[in-house]
Amino acid sequence: MKKHFVVGETIKRFLRIGTSLALSISTLSLLPSAPRLSSAAGTIKIMPLGDSITYGMADEGGYRKYLSYFLQQKGYTNVDLVGPEGKDSASFNYNGQSVKYDDNHAGYSGYTITNLPGGWFGQLNGILETMQGGDYIKKYSPDIILLQIGTNDVSNGHLDGSEERLHKLLDYLRENMPSNGKVFLTTIPDLGNSGWGGNSNGDIAKYNELIKKVANDYSSKNVIYADIHSVIDASKDLADGVHPNAGGYEKMGKYWLEQIEGYLKASDGPQQTQPTQPSQGDSGPELIYGDLDGDKTITSFDAVIMRKGLINDFKDNNVKKAADIDQNGKAEVADLVQLQSFIIGKIKEFTVAEKTVTEKPVFEKSYNFPAVNQLKSSKDIPDPFIFMDGSKVESTDDWWKRQSEISCMYEYYMYGKWIDGSDDETTYSISGNSMTINVKRKSTGKTASFKAVINLPKNVRHEGGAPVILGMHKGISESTATSNGYAVITYDSDGMFSAPGTAQDNNQHKGAFYDLYPYGRNWDEQTGDLMAWSWGISRILDALYNGAAKELNINPDSSIVTGVSRYGKAASVCGAFDTRIKMCAPSCSGAGGLALYRYSSVGKTYDFSSKGGSSSYTYKENEPLGSLQASGEQGWFNGRFMEFRNAEQFPMDQHMLGALCCDPDRYLFIIGSCESEDWVNAPSVWMAYLGMKHVWDYVGISDHLAINIHKSGHAVIAEDIEKMVQYFDYHVYGIQPKMNLEELQTSVFALPKNKDSFADTFASKWLY
């Protein structure tokens, strides 16, 4: 098939867009800000502020959902929960009924009172600096702040100095909130036997005495003492030794209602304002075919450039792309004929070859690669269209062959051998919301098992059963998914610091996977944890295909894999290697996931105000190769990975891992977080996305790739799930989305004020 486009109109349209864009950029700083909208008089704004307990770790929505619901039941219709996180409306199941609640908050997992040294990434992020960075107290102007903070200070050995840090935080809050506003400062609960940081309850008792003292010192400044410690029984009310379970959060919701109700009855609630947010820009100008000299007109000069390029080969890849007039992937004589015919007026439009997407062929695996010490270092981002032997991809079939080679490269150099399940016999058993996966290795007779947790939607609205999100851990906004008709099955492990049963999170290589496939001396016996965790997700999928899907009314053909942090890396790997998975959706995956090793954002400053964040945020430290090769993380990879002296030795970079998901029948949905996520390097994830896009464009399935960079939160947040399911519903089921899906083709890093010129240059030497 052939299709036509009118060249003149294309150029005119481009010029209109370019002029408009230039005008909007040049005048943006001169335009007055939009007037802020006032909420109804009498509205009382409440900001839940704190760490992961405020966030709701272990039971999405935490105490906030209960407080919101109890306020509704008491008839308080003039209360608005506020904060930069969450959304205006969410729902949960309470006493057999679906209950709506206000999900806005300012809770951040792992945060301390102020920035402190320590933690997994070398720095513990502070609530004070986060509020200052986004100017959130002035933006949301809360009448009441429910402040619970300090668990991470104590558990990380920072009890000393906590009183002074509390003073700094309270001074900032009181200076920036309404003068008659109240801060309810609460104690923190004890830790259970499995709590992080060991037995810290002695220090917690000391810290809680400080809370009482500080609240008393600030009593004249509208700071009120609260005592959550008295509400939570660590032996009964904790889900994981740190975070409350549903019953514990319910107790907290009731307690907070009791504490604030007197103020609610006495207050008329001052009139407040909400901030406005500018819209994001696009990701750059479009290519004009035939305009080889870049002057936005097509003349005989372009024909001269094309003739020289066809004779001597094109030196500039962007010129070569503009010369591919029929868009068949090659600049050739047929393109020159069309160009000359257009210039002399013989034709008024170019004829473009319709791209057809063919089914992927299967290639035999080959691991005949050079040793690490034979690889040449290069600062350039590797061209995905060049084979290891230097030959070029010249057709779609060539690409599928190259994709197979890249897959083998990742096994050989980074993650270890992919175990495809052909030697596994998988059975399952279901009890309530728990599923046990039993695996027998056929060749040895060895057996192993691990557990998963099932979350089912109340109503299945998709034909063929509910789509299923397969999570590397709990805490992936399950209730948002189920409210959209999606099932969620996760490993029975809490959050990003609790390892699944398939492999321990260390370099010991123990767990269900290694019981069946012991770590050995040969490279093909050295499968790392990321592959092992991925193997477990694949066995869950086996169980679904083997009968569990029918029992649960789930459609296993509509599966999505996700996870955060190290499990974001694992989700990237799982989606790359198990082609049965319909969509891969890794979050905050960083180096070793979907962030380029070769791109650093250290020292770069960005404006995140369009996301409700800081207008001047500077990245301080990215996750380096050395960290991944350290003792605590080297178990994620294979032995050969430890041989690399620097990232410039890699014959691939992580845009090529993402490119393993390029498939006519599959999708990649990348999730990132831009603020307070220096370590996982969201700007580099954006660069990797731009690199991947060359592959999807070449194959002709550009809309099978998407990205969502949320403001903050080292997590799969509700926003991500909402956008993910709309994207999936549209592409897989044809359900029209409420959002504009074009938003998922850009990010805050594409805005003119944030754009790095590297985005336009790093792929300029690539074939396509």
Curated annotation (Swiss-Prot):
InterPro entries: AB_hydrolase_fold, Dockerin_1_rpt, Dockerin_dom, Dockerin_dom_sf, Ester_Hydrolysis_Enzymes, GCE-like_dom, GDSL, SGNH_hydro_sf. Residues 285-352 form the Dockerin domain. GO terms for biological process: xylan catabolic process. A motif (GXSYXG catalytic site motif) lies at residues 563-568. One of its GO terms (cellular component) is extracellular region. In the N-terminal section; belongs to the carbohydrate esterase 3 (CE3) family. In the C-terminal section; belongs to the carbohydrate esterase 15 (CE15) family. Esterase involved in the degradation of plant cell wall polysaccharides. Catalyzes the deacetylation of chemically acetylated xylan and native, steam-extracted xylan. Seems to act in synergy with the xylanase XynD which produces xylo-oligosaccharides. Also catalyzes the deesterification of methyl esters of 4-O-methyl-D-glucuronic acid (MeGlcA) side residues in synthetic glucuronoxylan methyl ester, suggesting that it may be able to cleave ester linkages between MeGlcA carboxyl and more complex alcohols, including linkages between hemicellulose and lignin alcohols in plant cell walls. This is Multidomain esterase. It comes from Ruminococcus flavefaciens. The gene is cesA.
